[in-house]
């Protein structure tokens, strides 16, 4: 899997696409944990890529939620 998880690429995706991608990455992360625990891990660098991609997606989701909250509170004032 030669996926790129650059912030600019992730910002272009919809919220539903990000949630689906996050779910897939979480599943992959679990599979990597099990394979590492059993000693069958082949691609150890992928663990780092997946972990960082999950963090990027969560960060973007949090930022968009904060922006939406700031807009509604500014509109109320």
Swiss-Prot record:
A GO molecular-function descriptor: structural constituent of ribosome
Listed InterPro entries: Ribosomal_protein_uL29, Ribosomal_uL29, Ribosomal_uL29_CS, Ribosomal_uL29_sf
Superkingdom to which the source organism belongs: Bacteria
Keyword Isomerase set for record: no
UniProt keyword annotations, A-Z: Ribonucleoprotein, Ribosomal protein
One GO CC term, this protein: cytosolic large ribosomal subunit
Leader peptide range in chain numbering: none
BP term (GO), one: translation
Keyword Ribonucleoprotein: yes
Family indicated by similarity: Belongs to the universal ribosomal protein uL29 family.
Protein name as annotated: Large ribosomal subunit protein uL29
Lineage per the UniProt record: Bacteria, Pseudomonadati, Pseudomonadota, Alphaproteobacteria, Acetobacterales
Gene: rpmC
């Amino acid at each position: 899997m030669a996926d790129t998880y650059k912030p600019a690429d992730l910002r272009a995706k919809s919220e539903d696409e990000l949630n689906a991608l996050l779910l897939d990455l979480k599943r992959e992360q679990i599979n990597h944990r099990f394979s590492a625990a059993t000693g069958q891990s082949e691609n150890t660098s992928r663990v780092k890529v997946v972990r960082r991609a999950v963090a990027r997606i969560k960060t973007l989701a949090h930022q968009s939620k904060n922006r939406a909250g700031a807009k509604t509170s500014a509109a109320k004032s």
